[in-house]
A protein has these predicted regions:
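Hydrophobic, membrane-inserted alpha-helices
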Residues: 1, 18-19, 38-44, 184-188, ...
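Internal/C-terminal transmembrane anchor helices
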Residues: 84-102
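Periplasmic/ER-lumenal interhelical loops and adjacent helix-loop junctions
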Residues: 96-191, 239, 297-309
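Aromatic- and kink-enriched transmembrane "portal" helix at the membrane-lumen/periplasm boundary
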Residues: 1-11, 44-48
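Contiguous transmembrane helix-bundle modules in multi-pass membrane proteins
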Residues: 7-15, 27-41, 53-54, 60-61, ...
């Protein structure tokens, strides 16, 4: 996600999730509760970052991750671990919510007296990612960029709705860009194939993959049905607009899957190389090359004739 300077509190809130996730995993592996105390303090910093939508996403992700391991422990009949995990979640909520309560209560009181108390769906879906934005995974500026002043030597964002494009305005470049680097993309598919062909299932690839895809579909907002379901049936989601702000969950989860692939390449090169082979690399490189050429030669833009009107 690319952030407006005026939206830095969004970044200041979301940035704590990877560290909280790391601490929670350390607790799972060691059963040492001081990691949970640190995780609670970390999530407190997420709340104090001052962007409610983002810290709600952070808590939901961490809660789902805890449920995933609670289910795994229950399935393996490790009741002691189940109890420990439930207690750990309660501790995180108490520490983070307790320390930041002075801000939470004030924020809730303010929201009850603001115009966003009863927002409609038309307002809530503002800032939706479009399925066409998936192309930004390969070329981040494929639709141009947010040209912040007349002297900036950048390609202006051209695919805007008033010209027949797919996005509501040039500012959507800061929300709808999904780029996580080509290096990460190279490893994602081999990592998934390796996981399903391996007996070792310690890495929660299925969890990250499913949650990441749900986050992506949610970010589509008014361009897909998932966001409307959350808006209608799940508390708090009718308080927020800009569903595209959830894309950091997609970025993180698929980045972790790519990291898993890199780890397997170093630890089990012979097996992993069956999936990260020359044939795959040639296909991937060729696709990216053709896609890049289509961008720089203007062929891609010519497929959107109305965007230049």
């Amino acid at each position: 996600m690319i952030i407006h300077m005026m939206h830095m509190n969004l970044l200041e809130s979301l940035i704590w999730l990877p560290f909280a996730l790391y601490l929670f995993l350390k607790f799972i592996n060691t059963n040492k509760f001081y990691f949970i105390i640190l995780a609670g303090l970390t999530m407190c910093l997420s709340i104090l970052g001052g962007y409610p939508q983002t810290f709600v996403f952070n808590f939901i992700f961490l809660g789902l991750f805890a449920l995933y391991y609670i289910y795994k422990s229950y399935k393996s009949k490790d009741n002691k671990k189940v109890i420990q995990l439930i207690i750990s979640v309660i501790i995180i909520v108490i520490i983070s919510g307790g320390i930041s309560s002075f801000q939470l209560f004030a924020t809730n009181e303010f929201s009850e007296n603001s115009e966003r108390q009863n927002i409609g769906y038309e307002f809530a879906k503002q800032g939706s990612v479009h399925p066409l934005d998936i192309f930004t995974l390969f070329v981040p500026k494929i639709f141009g960029t947010f040209n912040w002043n007349d002297k900036a030597d950048e390609l202006s964002y051209w695919s805007v709705s008033k010209s027949g494009g797919h996005q509501e305005g040039s500012w959507m470049f800061t929300i709808s860009t999904l780029y996580i680097s080509l290096l990460a993309l190279i490893f994602i598919i081999p990592a998934i194939r390796y996981y399903f062909n391996s007996k070792e299932k310690n890495f929660p690839l299925l969890f990250f993959g499913i949650v990441g895809l749900i986050a992506l579909f949610f970010s589509f907002g008014g361009n897909f049905f998932v966001h409307k379901i959350f808006f209608d049936f799940i508390p708090l989601f009718d308080r927020f607009r800009n569903p595209g702000h959830i894309t950091f969950i997609f970025t993180m989860t698929f980045g972790l899957i790519a990291a898993y692939g890199i780890d397997r390449l170093t630890e089990d090169k012979k097996q992993f190389s069956q999936f990260l082979n020359k044939k795959y690399l040639i296909f991937f490189s060729g696709f990216v090359l053709l896609f890049t050429l289509a961008f720089y030669t203007g062929i891609f833009k010519s497929l959107f004739p109305l965007s230049s009107n």
